[in-house]
Curated annotation (Swiss-Prot):
Pfam families: Proteasome (PF00227)
Induction of the gene: During cell proliferation.
PROSITE patterns given in the database record: PROTEASOME_BETA_1, PROTEASOME_BETA_2
Cellular location(s): Cytoplasm; Nucleus
GO cellular component, one term: plasma membrane
Expression sites by tissue: Present in all tissues examined. Slightly lower levels in roots.
Entry keyword annotation includes Iron: no
Superkingdom classification of source: Eukaryota
GO annotation terms (biological process): defense response to fungus; proteolysis involved in protein catabolic process
Chief location bin: cytoplasm
Protein name: Proteasome subunit beta type-1
Function noted in UniProt: Non-catalytic component of the proteasome, a multicatalytic proteinase complex which is characterized by its ability to cleave peptides with Arg, Phe, Tyr, Leu, and Glu adjacent to the leaving group at neutral or slightly basic pH. The proteasome has an ATP-dependent proteolytic activity.
Length: 223
């Protein structure tokens, strides 16, 4: 076996950062559009946000080939669900499906780090954050990807989500208005782009509300 073969890995990390914030009647999901490997930029216009249902949007960083495979599985299972139940999945139902799908592949996992955002059955914003093998939690805000270690302390400082151990159970939604949440997302990405070479080029923001989805774009550093 040559040294080249010995060092071969089925995985790559294509970088990028994803953030989601849940509000009282909205959910903001954002990700940069840079896809890279090592010190090479493969694309400056690659969307990491994927609409799974009218009220559920997935944003993923990691190995983008695995991300695409995961999206295909979720899309096909959601189609089966629609044929059987004559309705679309809610965001919490999609969150459980994503957890089951990731856990099923735990011995050869999808190298994908996911944030799922959307609206629950009551119309409130919800965010679910995952590890690679399906362990997940409903939170008020979350970040995944190469810039998440820079962004999460910033969000913790600004939002301070209540502990899930508090009784009675606290509402996990953030107190921000929709405009404030969008401004905060723009600020954290502008900051992370200064320090993380795998995050940059453009910021794609999706805002989910009961009346539909809006999309915004913002330029980031291109170096």
């Amino acid at each position: 076996m040559t040294k080249q073969h010995a060092n071969w890995s089925p995985y790559d990390n294509n970088g990028g950062t994803c953030v989601a914030i849940a509000g009282s009647d909205y959910c903001v999901i954002a990700a940069d559009t840079r896809m890279s490997t090592g010190y090479s930029i493969l694309s400056r216009d690659y969307s990491k946000i994927h609409k799974l249902a009218d009220r559920a949007v997935l944003s993923s960083s990691g190995f983008q080939a695995d991300v695409k495979a995961l999206q295909k599985v979720l899309k096909s299972r959601h189609l089966i669900y629609q044929h059987q139940h004559n309705k679309q999945m809610s965001c919490p139902a999609m969150a459980q499906l994503l957890s089951n799908t990731l856990y099923f592949k735990r011995f050869f996992p999808y190298y994908a780090f996911n944030v799922l955002g959307g609206l629950d059955e009551e119309g409130k914003g919800c965010v679910f954050t995952y590890d690679a093998v399906g362990s997940y939690e409903r939170v008020g805000y979350g970040a995944q990807g190469s810039g998440s270690t820079l962004i999460m302390p910033f969000l913790d400082n600004q939002l301070k989500s209540p502990s899930p151990l508090l009784l009675p159970k606290q509402d996990s939604n953030t107190p921000l208005s929709e405009a404030e949440a969008v401004d905060l997302v723009k600020t954290v990405f502008a900051s992370a782009t200064e320090r993380d070479i795998y995050t940059g080029d453009k910021l794609e923001i999706m805002i989910l509300k009961a009346d539909g989805i809006k999309t915004e774009l913002m330029d980031l550093r291109k170096d």
